Amino acid sequence: MTDPSAQHSAPPLATVADIMRPPVTAVEQNDHVGAAAYLMKRADATALIVTQAQTGQPVGIITEADISHAVADGKNPNDVRIYQMMTARPTVVNISTSIRDAAKVMTSGRFRHLPVMGDAGLVGIVDITDVCRALLEADVSGSSADTAQPEQSSPH
């Protein structure tokens, strides 16, 4: 007969909560794209959550790629409003979403950033680097990507 105290429970599943970066840097939808670029540089971020000016509620996301496309199209970032360039109603994941499932969402949707939602609303953001790092660390350690416990990445 086996001693019940000798049995080990499975490690907890690693979720986006383990790798996300709170707090999220936000910018208002009516600000200029140039202001978003400045905030990204200051916060060392590659994406910002866009909020509605009156309520502060998240309404979109703007990324480095969005800003690059505006500049490549000959637009002056100080003449373009964020709402004109942002992705409205971006795909989000729940705080309990596994890292593997987040990778699937990112791959199928070709997303580089995913806002993370909790019971109280927006709680963080994960990017493709966070997810890849966690998957690589899980692979190197020989564990499942769903059971890896990656180190917290540096804040953006």
Name each model feature, range by range.
Residues 1-156:
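Tandem CBS (Cystathionine beta-synthase) repeat/Bateman regulatory domains
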